[in-house]
UniProtKB/Swiss-Prot annotation:
It comes from Burkholderia cenocepacia (strain HI2424). Pfam families: Rhodanese, UPF0176_N. It catalyses: uridine(34) in tRNA + AH2 + O2 = 5-hydroxyuridine(34) in tRNA + A + H2O. One of its GO terms (molecular function) is oxidoreductase activity, acting on paired donors, with incorporation or reduction of molecular oxygen. It is an enzyme of class 1 (oxidoreductase). InterPro entries: Rhodanese-like_dom, Rhodanese-like_dom_sf, TrhO, TRHO_N. Belongs to the TrhO family. This is tRNA uridine(34) hydroxylase. The active site is at C186 (cysteine persulfide intermediate). Catalyzes oxygen-dependent 5-hydroxyuridine (ho5U) modification at position 34 in tRNAs. Residues 132-226 form the Rhodanese domain. Keywords: Oxidoreductase, tRNA processing. The lineage of its organism: Bacteria, Pseudomonadati, Pseudomonadota, Betaproteobacteria, Burkholderiales. PANTHER family: RHODANESE-LIKE DOMAIN-CONTAINING PROTEIN 7-RELATED (PTHR43268:SF3), THIOSULFATE SULFURTRANSFERASE/RHODANESE-LIKE DOMAIN-CONTAINING PROTEIN 2 (PTHR43268). Gene3D superfamilies: 3.30.70.100, Rhodanese-like domain (3.40.250.10).
Length: 284
């Protein structure tokens, strides 16, 4: 059976999450869906999977049911297919933020940060500057272990361990961004959108987010100006610029990414350990 995997997020002011939670949970269970939906005052973030019929019904429900008062009418979904269900259960959770930055919640009603689409970004990188002649700086907003799997050429990488560290490292490194066009990017768009909004709010000029993140960039223009693969938070571990799963795997014990080269190590035992396990244990 082919399973449809859906991912979506949307920054929008929400105030009825407690009332919605049991109703959304019930509808998802009726459809046989599994995955996680996060609801917060700043918006929605979801990863769910099910049959084609079930996912189509969910999209119609979340976009058009009167319960949501049109707040998700423009919600855009990223879709991928798998041969099996990647999630064990269905959860609808209430959160303070849909992606944790530990800063005052952003105000979606004030508008999103400007974005640049994949084709325009590629043209900028081809030329070495944007349309106004400013040098372009690619800013990776992901965690260090994700960056190690692949990133844009010459991207700024501040080696953060979690997204909540982002505001602090930006405050400490603002000089890197002065006089340049800054393009924040992440896997699918949510972190780079929130990062761009934060930078805009603290007065950094000429900030853009990469529309749809790395995965949308791969879909539109392939791997131009990018080296390596893109880490994803599911059973596939990483996708190449053709959006195909790679031979990278995730260590069952320490959750590190194990490359094909590392899989040749005697310390790699599938389902038990990998070369990174001792370092992970000492850091715990």
């Amino acid at each position: 059976m082919t399973i449809v995997n859906l991912a979506a997020y949307h920054f929008v002011s929400l105030d009825a999450n407690e009332q919605w939670r049991p109703l959304v949970t019930a509808r998802c269970n009726e459809l046989g869906l599994r995955g996680t939906i996060l609801l917060a005052p700043e918006g929605i973030n979801l990863f769910i999977a099910g049959t084609r019929e079930a996912t189509d019904a969910f999209i119609a429900y979340i976009r058009h049911d009167p319960l949501f008062e049109g707040k998700f009418a423009t919600l855009q979904f990223k879709e991928s297919l798998s041969d099996s269900q990647p999630f064990r259960r269905m959860l609808v959770r209430l959160k303070r933020e849909i992606i944790t930055m530990k800063k005052p919640a952003i105000k979606p009603e004030l508008g999103r940060a400007p974005f640049v689409d994949a084709r325009t970004l590629k043209a900028w990188l081809d030329r070495g500057h944007d349309d106004a002649g400013r040098p372009v700086v690619m800013l990776d907003t992901r965690n260090a272990f994700e960056v190690d799997v692949g990133t844009f050429d010459n991207a700024l990488d501040y080696r953060i361990d979690k997204f909540s560290e982002f505001p602090e490292v930006i405050d400490a490194n603002r000089a890197d961004l002065e006089g340049k066009t800054v393009v924040s990017f992440c896997t699918g768009g949510i972190r780079c959108e929130k990062a761009a909004i934060h930078m805009k709010e603290i007065g950094i000029d000429n900030v853009y987010q990469l529309e749809g993140g790395i995965l949308k960039y791969f879909e539109e223009v392939g791997g131009a100006h990018y080296h390596g693969d893109c880490f994803v938070f599911d059973y596939r571990t990483a996708l190449n610029p053709q959006l195909q799963p790679t031979e990278n795997v995730t260590c069952f014990a320490c959750r590190a990414v194990v490359t094909p080269e590392a899989q040749q190590s005697p310390s790699y035992v599938p389902g038990k350990s990998c070369p990174a396990c001792p370092q992970a244990a000492s850091a715990a």
